[in-house]
Amino acid sequence: MTGITLVQGDITRQSADAIVNAANSSLLGGGGVDGAIHRRGGPAILAECRRLRAGHLGKGLPTGRAVATTAGDLDARWVIHTVGPVWSATEDRSGLLASCYRESLRTADELGARTVAFPAISTGVYRWPMDDAARIAVETVATTKTSVTEIRFVLFDARAYEAFAARLG
């Protein structure tokens, strides 16, 4: 059975088999959690992302998909990069956000990861409303068949933590 836990803090300080990165499609680092993971993880992550871009991901990683790289200097074996959707008030993109969680867990299963740390995908510069993002995240991981034994949501601030806690009941 998969356990779901919540932590308020910095995802780059977590110890897990895999840390999920809310990446942009370029995979070359950016702001928010993406930039923090690249900075703390060191150049090995960026080097592997560049190799992926030079290979089968020449046009970048599509929204809702996931791919793994080394974790570099992080206390993890892998970073699973996933590209969340940008929030839209006029188009329902919730299926793409759910896909980020499902595809990350599928990738974790392929790697043999048992513990996975997730950020609140798309809630930063992509402006997804926190309560809705928490609902989608918790519902998706709770209903996805996986061999992962611990899913840890690592929430940056109290507002995010409270939104996820409300969804876990």
From Swiss-Prot:
<dbReference type="Pfam" id="PF01661">
    <property type="entry name" value="Macro"/>
</dbReference>
<dbReference type="InterPro" id="IPR002589">
    <property type="entry name" value="Macro_dom"/>
</dbReference>
<protein>
    <recommendedName>
        <fullName>Macro domain-containing protein SCO6450</fullName>
    </recommendedName>
</protein>
<comment type="similarity">
    <text>Belongs to the MacroD-type family.</text>
</comment>
<dbReference type="InterPro" id="IPR043472">
    <property type="entry name" value="Macro_dom-like"/>
</dbReference>
<feature type="domain" description="Macro">
    <location>
        <begin position="1"/>
        <end position="169"/>
    </location>
</feature>
